[in-house]
Amino acid sequence: RQTNTTDTDVFGLLDNTNFDVLDENSNKNGHVVSTQRDLIAGEISKDIARRKLIPADIVQAHDSGAIHFHDMDYIIQPMFNCCLINLEDMLANGTVINGKKIDTPRSFQVACTVTTQIIAQVASGQYGGQSINGIDRILAPYVRKSFGKYLEAVVEEQRDVYGIEPDMEKAEEIAWKRVKKEIKDGIQTIQYQINTLMTTNGQAPFVTLFMYFRPDYEYAREA
């Protein structure tokens, strides 16, 4: 119990023979250098936890298969497992990412980008999944902000470019078309970012996005 046991496990990760660890988490590709470093750190953490933190009878029960001690590679640190992100507050009131103040977004596209950055930061500071409840409801106000910008631009185009009196009905129709394209681009941003971002724990974020809004919601059309 007092002997360091990590050498074989670590070298097994380096030469791709430690299949127990390499195949344990399908979200982690142990052949990628950044992920491999996380797995190596995990083996060191497990060794310390087994020798210094977890009671001997629990370790014995785990090794015998009587129980499974989940996430042993993270237990030595006071980290969160899973969480429900308060995205609505972070977008409405601004947040801090990597020590930098992020103001409330002024468009749907920027709101989508900031959302993915928040997801990446949360994923890098914990080791479990994360959920966002009602993302359509949360992002809807930023659709309206984008619509307002497009409507103002279209009215200005009618007056200054085409030299005509603004037709608000037509202007709103054109503005909504531009908003719909921005929505498609923003959702694509979220999809691509979530699936391609690499966090500090060597994997893409594990995220659940739940969509829900009430029919009488103020931003029902935008949602």
Question: Where do the PLM segments sit?
Answer:
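Catalytic alpha/beta active-site cores
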Residues: 1-223
